[in-house]
Design a protein with these regions (language model features):
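Hydrophobic transmembrane alpha-helices and their immediate loop junctions
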Residues: 1-214
Length: 214
């Protein structure tokens, strides 16, 4: 129970932190773009194979679908319709980067909790180590736009940032649930050093993704 509670607690805190960062980076998507699919994909991957609970995979899948969809539109193979699968790749990179940055922090802070001793035979010698298996559910909010012809909005103007008003669209926040996980094993490092190194690498990858998307 304590392990589950800690996963829920750190997951909620991480989700709030991620939402703040996404808002600061002005990450937004059109409501018709189905950006929420990235969270659904991560949950499906978690069910199929926990080691693939990674938004890099989910983002790559959704980004590929968006690119193929737009190529088909440009080739006049399908009608554009609304903003279906119109996903700004820069915003998608920042979204994936922020989630990875937060994931790295989670791994460094909470990744060693619940680790179990394991043993293996290497070159005829029995060695002991630790196995890690953690999954955090992160509730996150995203700014979603919906193009409107009606100039009147129920959202108080004083509560809407200028960068949202400049789009000429109706904006709203929606909550999504994503899963990030950490599954690894070590026979050469201590529990603390293993999660710190892994967390640093994951966060560094996230920072690179953010810089590419900015």
């Amino acid at each position: 129970p304590i392990l589950v509670i800690s996963q829920l607690f750190f997951g909620i805190i991480a989700g709030v932190f991620a939402s703040v960062l996404l808002y600061m980076f002005k990450v937004n998507f059109y409501q018709e773009s189905y950006i929420e699919i990235i969270f659904l994909i991560s949950l499906i991957l978690m069910i199929l194979k926990p080691k693939y609970v990674c938004f890099a995979y989910s983002g790559a899948i959704l980004g590929s679908v968006s690119i193929v969809y737009n190529l088909m539109i440009n080739a006049n193979l399908i009608d554009k319709g609304n903003d279906l699968f119109y996903i700004p790749i820069g915003n998608l990179l920042i979204l994936v980067g922020v989630i990875h940055f937060i994931e790295g922090l989670l791994v460094a802070i909470d990744g060693s909790r619940g680790s179990i001793p394991v043993f293996t035979r290497i070159n005829g010698e029995i060695r002991g180590g630790f196995a890690f298996n953690r999954v955090w559910i992160m509730p996150m909010s995203l700014v979603l736009f919906q193009s409107v012809e009606d100039p009147f909005s129920s959202i108080p103007i004083s509560h809407v940032p200028a960068w949202i008003l400049a789009t000429g669209a109706l904006a709203g926040f929606e909550i999504f649930y994503g899963a990030v996980g950490y599954k690894s094993v070590t026979f050469t490092k201590s529990k603390t050093s293993k999660v710190l190194i892994s967390g640093s690498l994951i966060s560094s990858y996230g920072i690179i993704m953010i810089l590419l998307g900015v």
